[in-house]
């Protein structure tokens, strides 16, 4: 009986201690979940480069010249969604 209890304690300790003393570090994260802000602009630059490019959007859609305010609004929305994703927040549109 004592051997079974000892084996149970060892099994319990073997499963709890390795999980409690380790931390998973994702790419770009420092210990404690802090992100290096110097590389944040590089990350945004890489994201913008991955978007598909169209030479003249109006030639494809037949629209008028897009105002600079609409472009700024889209960039602001993109930056807000990136910041929310970084902080773990999600917003749901109705």
From Swiss-Prot:
Keyword S-adenosyl-L-methionine included in the entry's annotation: no
MF terms in GO: gonadotropin hormone-releasing hormone activity; gonadotropin-releasing hormone receptor binding
Residues recorded with modification Pyrrolidone carboxylic acid: 23
UniProt family annotation: Belongs to the GnRH family.
Keyword Transport (UniProt): no
GO cellular component, one term: extracellular space
Main localization category: secreted
Compartmental location: Secreted
Expression tissues: Synthesized in preoptic neurons and is transported to the pituitary in the preoptic-hypophyseal axons.
Protein name, entry field: Progonadoliberin-1
Function: Stimulates the secretion of gonadotropins. May be responsible for the regulation of the hypothalamic-pituitary-gonadal axis.
Coiled coil: none
Post-translational modification Glycine amide, affected residues: 32
Keyword tags: Amidation, Cleavage on pair of basic residues, Hormone, Pyrrolidone carboxylic acid, Secreted, Signal
N-terminal signal peptide: 1-22
InterPro entries the UniProt entry points to: GnRH, Gonadoliberin, Gonadoliberin_I_precursor
